[in-house]
Design a protein with these regions (language model features):
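Short helix-capping/linker segments at secondary-structure and domain boundaries
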Residues: 35-36, 97-99
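Functional cores of ribonucleases/endoribonucleases
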Residues: 48-97
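Short, solvent-exposed aromatic-acidic interface loops
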Residues: 102-109
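Short, surface-exposed linear patches
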Residues: 41, 90-93, 109
Length: 109
């Protein structure tokens, strides 16, 4: 729905990401991430990572969102080796087109 390259470019602008749902805020905190980290995940996405588009709400408003799944190898220090981690990201652009509303950012469960 949203041109991925445009969304990725927008992540480089300060203040352009908004964790839009309470659950998203909790999931991002659980990962030990901040909005810069979420922006980094979005910049790693490719068109092949696209999953689907769906309507999402935050309890007050609705947004048309694109959902992606990002798979990457990450070194887990406690285990001393790399594991394949799968992230699920769902986002929309705000009405102005200058704000990315992050609806979901969590690992697969």
């Amino acid at each position: 729905m949203y041109p991925l390259a445009d969304v990725q470019a927008l992540t480089l602008q300060a203040g352009s990401l908004n964790l839009w749902t309470r659950r998203c805020m909790q999931d991002v905190a659980k990962l030990g991430f901040d909005t810069d980290d979420v922006g980094g995940l979005i910049r790693e996405l490719t068109k092949q990572d696209y999953r689907d588009s769906e309507w999402c709400d935050n309890g007050n408003s609705w947004a048309a969102c694109d959902a992606y799944t990002l798979k990457r190898l990450e070194f887990i220090e406690a285990a001393g080796k790399s594991f394949r981690i799968e992230y699920f990201l769902k986002f929309a652009l705000g009405k102005s087109g200058k704000l990315i509303l992050i609806v979901s950012c969590h690992t697969s469960s």
